[in-house]
From Swiss-Prot:
Residue ranges, annotated region (Required for interaction with SLF1 and RAD18): 703-1174
Species: Pongo abelii
Keyword check for Metal-binding: no
Region span, Interaction with SIMC1: 636-1174
In-chain residues carrying the UniProt-annotated modification Phosphoserine: S482, S604, S608, S615
Compositionally biased intervals (Basic residues): 94-103
A GO CC term assigned to this protein in UniProt: site of double-strand break
Cell compartments where the protein resides: Nucleus; Nucleus, PML body
Entry protein name: SMC5-SMC6 complex localization factor protein 2
Entry-linked InterPro entries: CANIN_dom, FAM178
Amino acid sequence: MTRRCMPARPGFPSSPAPGSSPPRCHLRPGSTAHAAAGKRTESPGDRKQSIIDFFKPASKQGRHMLDSPQKSNIKYGGSRLSITGTERFERKLSSPKKSKTKRVPPEKSPIIEAFMKGVKEHHEDHGIHESCRPCVSLASKYLAKGTNIYVPSSYHLAKEMKSLKKNHRSPERRKSLFIHENNEKNDRDRGKTNADSKKQTTVAEADIFKNSSRSLSSRSSLSRHHPGESPLGAKFQLSLASYCRERELKRLRKEQMEQRINSENSFSEASNLSLKSSSIERKYKPRQEQRKQNDVIPGKNNLSNVENGHLSRKRSSSDSWEPTSAGSKQNKFPEKRKRNSVDSDLKSTRESMIPKARESFLEKRPDGPHQKEKFIKHIALKTPGDVLRLEDISKEPNDETDCSSAGLAPSNSGSSGHHSTRNSDQIRVAGTKETKMQKPHLPLSQEKSAIKKASNLQKNKTTSSMTKEKETKLPLLSHVPSAGSSLVPLNAKNCALPVSKKDKERSSSKECSGHSTESTKHKEHKAKTNKADSNVSSGKISGGPLCSEYGAPTKSPPAALEVVPCVPSPAAPSDKAPSERESSGNSNAGSSALKRKLRGDFDSDEESLGYNLDSDEEEETLKSLEEIMALNFNQTPATTGKPPALSKELRSQSSDYTGHDHPGTYTNTLERLVKEMEDTQRLDELQKQLQEDIRQGRGIKSPIRIGEEDSTDDEDGLLEEHKEFLKKFSVTIDAIPDHHPGEEIFNFLNSGKIFNQYTLDLRDSGFIGQSAVEKLILKSGKTDQIFLTTQGFLTSAYHYVQCPVPVLKWLFRMMSVHTDCIVSVQILSTLMEITIRNDTFSDSPVWPWIPSLSDVAAVFFNMGIDFRSLFPLENLQPDFNEDYLVSETQTTSRGKESEDSSYKPIFSTLPETNILNVVKFLGLCTSIHPEGYQDREIMLLILMLFKMSLEKQLKQIPLVDFQSLLINLMKNIRDWNTKVPELCLGINELSSHPHNLLWLVQLVPNWTSRGRQLRQCLSLVIISKLLDEKHEDVPNASNLQVSVLHRYLVQMKPSDLLKKMVLKKKAEQPDGIIDDSLHLELEKQAYYLTYILLHLVGEVSCSHSFSSGQRKHFVLLCGALEKHVKCDIREDARLFYRTKVKDLVARIHGKWQEIIQNCRPTQGQLHDFWVPDS
């Protein structure tokens, strides 16, 4: 079947479809040169002839042409470039006729024999690894079927070899892989024998890139055409020469490594190797020059060379690490590596320039086939002599001799040669630094060595500063990283790189912190060898200065990195370096040639170095830190001291500042500071005294005062004018508190005096269980009894049966005394549920159990309330006393535990939860069984609740449960009208403080009729008590109450109340004299009393709605309020309590006016008119 090739776009490779054999329609460069080189037209006859020649049948299918298109389309990376380089030519459509492939003649050509011989030698060479290099198969035999050797997918055979492609692989590829495995095994064996050597250094990258570039150029230069065709014969010879040169260099490197291992004096042997390598380079120099000329010639040869260079750059990305085995041998013996010759070091320096620049360019190359033209534009600037030349970096593997000749040429030339050599060095070192910075995988030892080399020359500050001032940087070096971080392998023992301070600072941010630090021993070594470095850098080597041999230096821009030879041994003193080098040169046969080569290569660098050293004397030295700080110190306000160690120039420059210095110009002297401290201390004391006076002038005892003696002393110490001032502007606060003061009702030390949760036992109550649950509870302990109760056993047991009284009483006591509030709430829930279930049994003749007055009194008494506080009134006492409560409880709960624990308090704080639970249960009992308590008992319970509400700790707790119980108790009183005056008089006696009495009035609920009545009557009783009026019977009618209220309101004038209090106080005083402070206190009490009385007046008048008949009484009350109370109050900013009383007056007056407006006027009057008082 005939295969047709689709035309491909220019600049893009044509790859075969997956799963198909590679196309055989690669057009020959010779026949399509016009189409690829430019837009030239070709005749149809030439095109047809080229197609026919291309598809001629081959002589033998088993043998392939060397590097023929049949093995093309090897893809590298993501750019999909092929080895053959023919993808840049446009592909033409093949003839529709079936053509036969031209066979290769069966006899072997001399080129193939030469390459086969190289492969055999390559197999014998165990020192170099070829594993990373793509193999070109040249054998006539194939591997056995089923051999698992990896071959990249891009190595496609021709269509005729499709049957053999699935079963065979190249024997040379297999051989190279075996060589790679043997070399790795040898390296592992050497690593075991040299286990004592811990320091591993990497092979110089110059050797790596040199070998890889040579091998690439040799392979890329091989012809892709038939050997019988004349246009490509010269290129076959050139590729063969390159291959032979590569084999020769491999042999030389192998000999050099063996000599380094076996011989201690490697200096002479290394020089011999360098001479041999230079002779080999001169041997192949004409062919390289002929190849360079082909780059300039336009046409077919130029285009093919460009393609070959392009492919050589493509291969360098995969073959850059090829000769690592050679480096591994050198790393095995780091002690002998220290004795390397200067020739090999300089050679590796030159070799590491352009290959690394090419590698950096390849690493930055964008992916994609359309970027292939950009590789040709990458050039290297070389200036041997005065001629500038652009050269493609792809041909760098053959330029080793050019580098050496370019380095030797300036030795016989003038200053222009030095300038051009420095420029080329700048360009190459720039590429090298950029490449090194882009490789983070470099070994740590190599980075440390480069950093040490840069740090050894950091002390030459004057030389580097002069170089930075007069150097002209090229545009190519504008983006180059610092030299401190460019790890150029210069073997650290013979050459060093002076690096500027700015570059070192810039490189420190890019290098790791661990690599940039130096040890203390290394710093000591730098201090010792500083003199040696300066002597060698000035040109004192081999017995004399180098600058004198080559004439005076010219002022040209110095190189960015100057390669300066230094002392071979870092431990040797500086004065012995020239003699040692002379003795080493005399003992070797090739020392003179080595010196000439050293002088020729670094002639330009030495001249620029000489120029820097000569100009160093004229440069002004940098000022030290002390001098700079002295200048800044002198520019500040003048001081008495002088900065130490001032130079003459600095003293002359700063004479203007020091001339005006005079002592005693400090703004903050010692005397001034002491005076300021004394003033500050005096002001602080005065501020404290004023604050104390302000506190004393307010009339409130200061918390700082301890006794009256201290206060009198403080008052005596004040001036009269100060006393008047404080008295005039003192502000009295909290004269009328918002909350009642309350009383201490509960004594927690007496809590648990009768029983507690540990002494209460249901088995001691005389209860006999009948059901299974009752028996279970009786058999259980005290803790288990509480547990069964809270888990609902009692609720289920007495759901349909009456609960015995001992169980209910035990639950009531346990609820009041249990310290856990959650358990107390659960017991309350159980007790209320059982009580409600017992009330539903209507057929039962027995009322449900409710706690008696003695049970309630015993519970509150056990909480810590004194018996007298429970029943404070002498005329209203219960039928039992305190001893009865204690004896009754002891009879029900007997045992040693009760006697032992009776003296231990069970509560440390107010048991508000237990109190509220008892009140809640009492509220349930009074609502279920209203007739459970007698009127007397109800009155005692009401008085008990009122007394308990005066507890100080209950002021912030809403007593809603108390009010609910009070409503039930007032409702259950049978003879209400008879009991109201008695109840009011009893509540009036519960406290003597007016504000506490007002609290008791406000506790009475006003949302019931009995509650409002009790409030009105109680308010009138308390008003009469506070006004020292004789007790009279309180009228029940509301009209009479309002009329009585008008009489009381006239006596509520604050001034009248104050007079009464003053008279009463004078009667108590023996001398009958009242001072101003006491008078102020009495005034506060008078207004406080007025405030309480006005609240009680409001409770009387605003408790319920009034009829139209009471309208005239409210009109009289409003007039009396304004005339006697409001007009008597004189407001003052210092006396806030007056304003508070007047505000209450305004509110009461507003309420009364609302009542007046709501009441209808009397019959026959449309409007009310003011009638003056008679």
